[in-house]
């Protein structure tokens, strides 16, 4: 018998650091086992420590769940590679950092599975647009 989906929840958590206190406000109303989710998430993300890894949780009527990991947010990766804490308050007028085209390609390769394209060049353009909106310049190698 097919399980009936009750709800789908997406949350952003730091890899390997999920605990019931952090996920409680988002997942407690769904009725799933919070400790079970945290243990499963931490096990799945133990090789990605230090990154923010979004999780898409499909919750079924019987309170069981399925976890699917996504790639880290583009903004998080751009800030990490540019070495900045946050994006520009006034993008276009203010520059907070810069990345090389090789770093842009690396970020695009990481994000490619979650983007609506299969071309690395188009993925680079998508990530470059995000960088521009954050006040991060892209410099040629």
Curated annotation (Swiss-Prot):
SUPFAM superfamilies the UniProt entry points to: Ribosomal L11/L12e N-terminal domain, Ribosomal protein L11, C-terminal domain
Family matches, as Pfam families: Ribosomal_L11 (PF00298), Ribosomal_L11_N (PF03946)
InterPro entries, per the entry: Ribosomal_uL11, Ribosomal_uL11_bac-typ, Ribosomal_uL11_C, Ribosomal_uL11_C_sf, Ribosomal_uL11_CS, Ribosomal_uL11_N, Ribosomal_uL11_N_sf
Entry PTM: One or more lysine residues are methylated.
Gene3D superfamilies assigned: Ribosomal protein L11, C-terminal domain (1.10.10.250), Ribosomal protein L11/L12, N-terminal domain (3.30.1550.10)
Gene Ontology molecular functions: large ribosomal subunit rRNA binding; structural constituent of ribosome
Keyword tags: Methylation, Ribonucleoprotein, Ribosomal protein, RNA-binding, rRNA-binding
SMART domains, A to Z: RL11 (SM00649)
Single biological process term from Gene Ontology: translation
Chain coiled-coil ranges: none
One annotated Gene Ontology cellular component of this protein: large ribosomal subunit
PANTHER family xrefs: 60S RIBOSOMAL PROTEIN L12 (PTHR11661), LARGE RIBOSOMAL SUBUNIT PROTEIN UL11M (PTHR11661:SF1)
Function text: Forms part of the ribosomal stalk which helps the ribosome interact with GTP-bound translation factors.
Assembly and oligomerization: Part of the ribosomal stalk of the 50S ribosomal subunit. Interacts with L10 and the large rRNA to form the base of the stalk. L10 forms an elongated spine to which L12 dimers bind in a sequential fashion forming a multimeric L10(L12)X complex.
Family: Belongs to the universal ribosomal protein uL11 family.
Identification of the protein by name: Large ribosomal subunit protein uL11B
């Amino acid at each position: 018998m097919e399980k009936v989906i009750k709800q789908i929840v997406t949350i952003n958590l730091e890899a390997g650091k999920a605990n019931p206190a952090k996920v409680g406000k988002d997942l407690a109303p769904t009725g799933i086992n919070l400790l079970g989710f945290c243990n499963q998430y931490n096990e799945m993300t133990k090789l990605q420590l230090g990154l923010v890894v979004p999780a898409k949780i499909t919750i079924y009527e019987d309170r069981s769940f399925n976890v699917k990991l996504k790639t880290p947010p583009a903004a998080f990766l751009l800030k990490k590679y540019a070495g900045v804490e946050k994006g520009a308050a006034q993008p276009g007028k203010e520059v907070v950092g810069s990345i090389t085209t090789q770093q842009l390609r690396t970020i695009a390769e990481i994000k490619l599975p979650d983007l609506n394209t299969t071309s690395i060049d188009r993925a680079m353009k998508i990530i470059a647009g995000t960088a521009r909106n954050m006040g991060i310049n892209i410099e040629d190698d």
